[in-house]
Amino acid sequence: MEEIQRYLQPDRSQQHNFLYPLIFQEYIYALAHDHGLNRNRSVLLENPGYNNKFSLLIVKRLITRMYQQNNFLISTNDSNKNEFLGCNKSLYSQMISEGFAFIVEIPFSLRLISSLSSFEGKKIFKSHNLRSIHSTFPFLEDNFSHLNYVLDILIPYPVHLEILVQTLRYWVKDASSLHLLRFFLHEFWNLNSLITSKKPGYSFSKKNQRFFFFLYNSYVYECESTFVFLRNQSSRLRSTSFGALLERINFYGKMERLVEVFTKDLQVTLWLFKDPFMHYVRYQEKSILASKGTFLLMNKWKFYLVNFWQCHFSLCFHTGRIHINQLSNHSRDFMGYLSSVRLNPSMLRSQMLENSFLINNAIKKFDTLVPIIPLIGSLAKANFCTVLGHPISKPVWSDLSDSDIIDRFGRICRNLFHYYSGSSKKKTLYRIKYILRLSCARTLARKHKSTVRTFLKRSGSELLEEFLTSEEQVLSLTFPRASSSLWGVYRSRIWYLDIFCINDLANYQ
């Protein structure tokens, strides 16, 4: 971010915040490329992208062609091969989109830095812990056990392409940049299959992820504007959690003491939002709006959101995408966990003088479980086991060395144990560990043209020792003096603040 400010500071007064000239600067593509290298990779290491094709020479030739306004670059014909340098035309479009996405993020980033600087007295607030996905679950543990009903919401779809452009008009004042954005949406990609998908979960192609993530995040930010409005109207303290955090894939907000809200034109009181306990959480396209209120209040919230999104985005939003559920009677799939609020019955004996009474006291507890069936389905899709959970070999990795095979299987197991460390029951994780361990052994036996039993007898268990005890080694390093209580710590729920994305196997959708 300091590099961006250094490049932009001399030109801000002259360009009047115009972003379009930056697309002709070479350093923009270099910064976008370096930023892409720093993103978290898949554990399967199968997403090389275009980083190996990046070259400043190609960037210079690309900028020269844009200056010359060569129509061949933007022509839509059957040939996908560019005669200039023999490069694919999709590579040029991808590089332009990466640079453009990096440019249009600048107003959001500068606005975020200025708001955080003023909030902390010119000292930028570091919110790395809030970026972690696991930071959401302690919030759910502390608050959801006291609530009654929840709205399970799916972000509305589809949205017209022009709506996305109009949404960015409030942030990007440069008309040329908006025209270029409109050109990208209509000419280069079929956006209807990427952002306006009718599938339960949104999926992005491996190409141009930065560009589409930016569009999707800006669209979701606009969808949540109603919560931001109510939060700012009802509280004297300005909330920083609702800033345009471009690098975050999730955020949570808490709305307290939502009192009477008056509209500017009609001066009508919105009594349905008078709820002292309202909590909102979102990850990707799924949102949760929980309340301590009654079913009638949640039903009002539901129809308000449906009408608001239909009028604001000019789309047909079905009420079936919002479900009202009671927390104590329903388990929800959220962020790779099956979350629920269950009642723990407990008997208390109370004695008064010579009389004693038995009191049945039920305590609500927030519970998180590992969804075993979808997780086994993900392992089967990745060819680690069958759909019934029987381990099989992975022949694609048979050409690797023994250490690389063990390292890949061990890394997948460690990542899954790391992400699902907050599970209330670890028995499911040990079943996943058994599948990966036996799949690793069968892959090694296939490589050496032997059976699993013969291979283990000949090689011993040294090759799998690190794979078998990886999580115990992590805990032993964290708690070196804890010997008897080590397993007690491991069986308890642990939330980590260094998880910024869901693993491909954890995100089974």
UniProtKB/Swiss-Prot annotation:
Keywords, in A-Z order: Chloroplast, mRNA processing, Plastid, RNA-binding, tRNA processing
GO biological process: mRNA processing; RNA splicing; tRNA processing
Gene Ontology cellular component annotations, sorted alphabetically: chloroplast
Annotated compartments: Plastid, Chloroplast
Top-level taxon of origin: Eukaryota
InterPro entries, sorted: Domain_X, Maturase_MatK, Maturase_MatK_N
Disulfide bonds, paired cysteine numbers: none
GO terms of molecular function: RNA binding
Pfam families noted in UniProt: Intron_maturas2, MatK_N
The keyword tRNA processing belongs to this UniProt entry's keyword annotation: yes
Family statement drawn from the similarity comment of this UniProt entry: Belongs to the intron maturase 2 family. MatK subfamily.
The protein's role, per its UniProt record: Usually encoded in the trnK tRNA gene intron. Probably assists in splicing its own and other chloroplast group II introns.
Protein name per Swiss-Prot or TrEMBL: Maturase K
Species assigned in the record: Nicotiana paniculata
